[in-house]
Each structure stands twice: as structure tokens, then as C-alpha cells.
């Protein structure tokens, strides 16, 4: 899916309560974790909120347009978030991280099973401890409603 034009009005379509719920859930379960990588960050909403909580955040997306919006939001909200354009199927980190997030159905865009496996392998290798990985949290929340 191309986010070229969509990136600039994406936030107006998203429910802010979902973001609030994500942050509350993350804060309750892994509040002591300081280094965070977000895969598929979109316009950076979660990354910005985590940075406000004092986390060291690297936010990534494959869409340059989403990252452009995220860059300006970081400036507007006066937060320091490292933004990087990467494919979540092909990433490596210089130092291991406390937490890796992949939210808002981002993993659903990886349709090849081999690539999905690669995302999990890369994630496993990038974590200090393999005890927390939040993937597609929205599905868990929605599933409870059925």
C-alpha cells in the first residue's frame, strides 16, 4: 500500500483512544524499559508519546511520507526520536534493545511467510531479553470485544 498522500491525513482517521490504551498498556507492563524500537511507526504517534515518558526511541517505517510527517510532529512536540526508513523484514541494530513494538496492524503488511519469519528472527536478535514483544496489539483488544 502506498502512503504517499494518505500519510498527511492518517492521524485524522485514527482513534486517539487506541494510542492512549497502547501507552497505558506499555507503561503498566514494561515501564522500566528504556530503549525502544518501533517497527511500522507510521506518523510517529506512539514513538512521540514514549519519548515524552523519557524513553529512548527509534521509530522506523518503510514509508518516507509517514516518516516525513513523524519528523515534523517530533519538532512540534519537542521530542527527540530517531527516525529511520527501513523495511521491518530486513533490519539489524547496533546494540540490543529493551523493547520492540510493532503495533496498529503493521505486521499485516508483510504477506510473505518467509519475510514474517525474518521479522521475528531480527526482533529476537535485537532484544536484550526475549520477554516482551508487542505485535498487532489492536487485534488483541478488538478480539476481546467479539
Residue map of PLM features:
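Residues lining the SAM
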Residues: 103-105
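A short glycine-rich, Lys/Arg-flanked "PGG" loop and its adjoining helix->strand segment in the class I
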Residues: 117-129
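A short acidic, Gly/Pro-enriched loop at the edge of an enzyme's catalytic core
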Residues: 92-99
Amino acid at each position: 500500500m502506498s502512503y504517499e498522500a494518505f500519510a498527511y491525513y492518517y492521524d485524522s482517521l485514527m482513534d486517539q483512544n487506541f494510542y492512549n490504551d497502547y501507552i497505558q498498556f506499555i507503561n503498566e507492563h514494561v515501564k522500566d524499559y528504556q530503549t525502544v524500537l518501533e517497527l511500522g511507526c507510521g506518523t510517529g504517534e506512539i514513538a512521540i508519546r514514549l519519548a515524552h515518558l523519557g524513553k529512548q526511541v527509534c521509530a522506523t517505517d518503510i514509508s518516507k511520507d509517514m516518516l516525513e510527517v513523524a519528523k515534523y510532529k517530533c519538532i512540534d512536540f519537542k521530542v527527540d526520536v530517531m527516525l529511520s526508513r527501513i523495511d521491518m523484514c530486513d533490519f539489524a541494530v547496533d546494540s540490543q534493545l529493551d523493547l520492540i513494538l510493532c503495533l496498529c496492524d503493521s505486521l499485516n503488511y508483510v504477506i510473505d511467510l518467509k519475510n514474517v519469519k525474518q521479522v521475528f528472527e531480527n526482533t529476537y536478535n535485537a532484544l536484550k531479553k526475549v520477554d516482551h514483544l508487542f505485535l498487532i496489539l489492536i487485534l488483541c483488544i478488538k478480539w476481546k470485544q467479539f
